[in-house]
Amino acid sequence: MNELLLQGLSELGLDVSRAETLERFSSLLLEKNEVMNLTAITEPDAVAQLHLLDSAALLPFVDLTGKTVVDVGTGAGFPGMPLRILKDDFDLTLLDSLGKRVNWLQEVCDELQLKRVACVHARAEEFAMQHREQFDIATSRAVAQLSILSELCLPLIKVGGQFIAMKSVDTEDEIAAAKSAIKTLGGHIVKVEDYTIPTSDVVHRLVIVQKVSPTPRAYPRAFAKIKKAPL
């Protein structure tokens, strides 16, 4: 058993009995990474810290119980998969635009017998048009600039729900530049919280956005327009 993982879960006050399943997920990730580009982090201790514990560090800041959660641009399943392994009392949608990643995530969910998970192959802006304001919480980690990410995520969230962006700490300018977009899309930044990944000295940042009003029907735009002219 990975000692860093056990220590980190303990520091976060989380159920250490889930460490075995998290470690199995890590093994499946590194095994598949040999034939598919899933992660540049390939050392087990680094995976434990920079993927598993980084994702788990979200839990003290948000109550997922009974919620509908969408992980936008989930990639290899972060933060969504560790959140699901650690907590099984919410509904999770893992959303990614690359079909082979989504297929692999479904295989992992089956292998680990994870319930209440939907693995969806779709572009976020197209998915948002079909599932407008249907989720309580949207998460996203290191996917895009916050102004772009807000247009992909906020349309998915119900009024009263939250969008949580996981960022690096050097994002003051990025956050300031995104405030107008967030307001236009019906959101309001309620907290910017820095946290240290357990067992490491790496500091990351959460940007927590509350959905305070419906997103105008004009959004999200086609991704080419979002990228060319961010709000």
Annotate each predicted stretch with a short phrase:
Residues 9, 33, 108-109, 179-182:
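Conserved hydrophobic residues forming the short capping helix/wall of the S-adenosyl-L-methionine
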Residues 160-170:
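Conserved beta-strand signature within the Rossmann-like core of class I S-adenosyl-L-methionine
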Residues 31, 35, 47-66:
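Conserved alpha-helix/loop element of class I SAM-dependent methyltransferases that forms part
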Residues 56-142, 150-151:
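Conserved SAM/SAH cofactor-binding pocket of Class I
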Residues 101-103, 171, 175:
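Short alpha-helix immediately C-terminal to the canonical SAM-binding loop
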Residues 1-38:
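N-terminal auxiliary segments of SAM/dcSAM-dependent transferases
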Residues 87, 157-159:
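Helix-to-beta-strand junctions that scaffold the AdoMet/dcAdoMet cofactor pocket
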Residues 176-231:
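SAM/dcSAM-binding transferase cores
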